[in-house]
Amino acid sequence: MKKPRKDLFDEVKGIFTNYLKAQDYRKTQGRYDILYEIYSIDEHFEVETLYLTLKNKNYHISRATIYNTIDLLLDCGLIVKHSFGTKAGSYEKAYGSKQHDHLINIENKSV
């Protein structure tokens, strides 16, 4: 994973902050850490993969916090969810990303 562009991350952080204020939600470091890591990913991700990434980087963030933050980020349009025929949904960042299509290999279910 690489660092997100600072200008892009500042924009999405501002959007998220405004959303949290408007909804009267707390602005916690954990939520911003999750947002930062998501915007460091250049591909689709699943919640479990994100959790392991955060854990390996010594963040102390629970799965519940990740799931709750994912819901908030979906609501404010900063990420999108895809269902590619697997049990777990796949997510990707939405802001600052170019329109693209998804091709699914029906033999091995890869995207």
What is each PLM-predicted segment?
Residues 32-37:
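Pre-recognition alpha-helix immediately N-terminal to the DNA-recognition helix
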Residues 25, 39-42, 56-57:
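Short helix-capping/hinge SLiMs at alpha-helix to coil transitions
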Residues 49-55, 66:
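A short acidic, leucine-rich amphipathic alpha-helix
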Residues 66-76:
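Basic amphipathic alpha-helical segments that dock to polyanions
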